[in-house]
Amino acid sequence: MGLLSILRKLKSAPDQEVRILLLGLDNAGKTTLLKQLASEDISHITPTQGFNIKSVQSQGFKLNVWDIGGQRKIRPYWRNYFENTDILIYVIDSADRKRFEETGQELAELLEEEKLSCVPVLIFANKQDLLTAAPASEIAEGLNLHTIRDRVWQIQSCSALTGEGVQDGMNWVCKNVNAKKK
Amino acid sequence: MKLKSLLLRYYPPGIMLEYETNGELKTKSIDLLELDPSTDVGALVEEIQKAEPLITASRAEKVRLLVQRLQAKLEQNSKHIFCLVKVLRAHILPLTNVALNKSGSCFITGSYDRMCKVWDTRSGEQLHTLEGHRNVVYTIAFNNPYGDKIATGSFDKTCKLWSAETGECYHTFRGHTAEIVCLSFNPQSTLVATGSMDTTAKLWDIQSGEEVFTLTGHLAEIISLSFDTSGSRIITGSFDHTVIVWDTSTARKVHTLIGHCAEISSSVFNWDCSLILTGSMDKTCMLWDATNGKCIATLTGHDDEILDSCFDYAGKLFATASADGTARVYCTATRKCISKLEGHEGEISKISFNPQGNRLLTGSSDKTARIWDAHTGECLQVLEGHVDEIFSCTFNYKGNIVITGSKDNTCRIWC
């Protein structure tokens, strides 16, 4: 990667490149999702202390996905990465009901950010492989997603571990990038 | 004209003459860029005497001793083995760049956590935290050789000037409309130049804090800039595939170096400012005549993008680092590749010579930095320990300290 490649990914992307920001609380499964997207080994994933960037080809687009660490103390730095974001993907641990309020709060704050205004948001209701996982519909309701009116949004249940639902989510991403970039 | 004193400059080797003329004290330098450990000192002193009237027969012996000192300095620390002395959990987010002051007594780190920190090299103690930027601190510099000021350039579009001694912020330079990604003090330490993703570079007055000039002309992001040795010209390298040479006193374009067919990754002058070396994503590097802006040579051979390039202090050699995981060393005079540095298991994003010019330091995405013999290409040391890729690495002026900064949020001191 190197600093220079980061600068190249920073500039406003050409038409066929999409800048995707992957956010969510710690342990939501962002890095696992990133690695699943890049078809990489997901057996040894540690908490992200900074960020990871991967580029994946999908439906004629080059998706530059930025996975940003979600621990509380580094959340104030999320805004370092807002510039030129085409799509926001917000990942939720559907089995961690204790933190639904916290994750809802963080999402609400993101949707208030000026630099992310009108940016389409995909919410992954992750960890559906766990028996205790709340269904996407319940999360949508709990987070009042239906009140989002200033942008297109979608909630998609998935398991970053098994890969189920991930492609459906990315299809939605490509479709909405299409709409935006055209 | 009366010679008052003789001073030494170790790297690149040179003798400074302080002399008096019409009651005025002046200086000039005798550059000994070709000096190497095998140079015949007697013959060189004779040559100096012939060319420089201030060096009279009575001074010859003194000059001979000085040249021998310079010769010894070129070999100093050449057998040095680097050992890890400190791991600093410097920041809570990845580091960007690191920089040392000239003596090596302290160094600075920039980070995604929006701070720049000043560290004591010997103790590893944190001396100051330079806080105030609202986004990533990407590019940082000391005003060497003085080392009393620090400049920081940020993704928040501003550059700040700080006291290295107290950590006080003297000025915030505002005006760029996008991220600042490269900066440099001029050699006199009267100006700071900043290069930005907004396609412009700006020169700022250190005393007044005012903008002096905006250098407008590039069609895409500026990602590299450097002054020449005198400070009268500056070059900017851009994602628009070109490098522009500017006159710093008028902000006029002197030359546009057109030839690369992809983004520029680095651009530097050699010491005597006769040449410019540029590296590009087009997998080549080019040598240019700095006086007329003409391309002298295109060096091919790398299988992937060139991410960094540099001259040694004297300009005798230059080196390129590539995303293909190798680096190459070239002789400036012949433009022949004299060695290939093979061994890294990932792209090499940083390369620099030690001031003596016999060693190279590379930093890679394989999480290691390596020390190489510049002439044979042999890997002498692998500096291992970082747990994520290395974003920056640098030698001090004596060539016996290395600082590495990593995406793993730490920096390491190797002595």
Swiss-Prot record, chain A:
GTP binds at residues 24-31, 48, 67-71, 126-129, 159-161. It is a peripheral membrane protein. The keyword Protein biosynthesis does not apply. This is ADP-ribosylation factor-like protein 3. Mg(2+) binds at residues 31, 48. One of its GO terms (molecular function) is GDP binding. CDD domains: Arl3. GO terms for cellular component: centrosome; cilium; cytoplasmic microtubule; Golgi apparatus; Golgi membrane; midbody; nucleus; photoreceptor connecting cilium. Found in a complex with ARL3, RP2 and UNC119 (or UNC119B); RP2 induces hydrolysis of GTP ARL3 in the complex, leading to the release of UNC119 (or UNC119B). Interacts with RP2; interaction is direct and stimulated with the activated GTP-bound form of ARL3. Interacts with SYS1. Interacts with ARL2BP; the GTP-bound form interacts with ARL2BP. Microtubule-associated protein. Does not interact with TBCC. Interacts with RP2. Interacts with PDE6D; the interaction occurs specifically with the GTP-bound form of ARL3. Keywords: Cell cycle, Cell division, Cell projection, Cytoplasm, Cytoskeleton, Golgi apparatus, GTP-binding, Lipoprotein, Magnesium, Membrane, Metal-binding, Myristate, Nucleotide-binding, Nucleus, Phosphoprotein, Protein transport, Transport. Belongs to the small GTPase superfamily. Arf family.
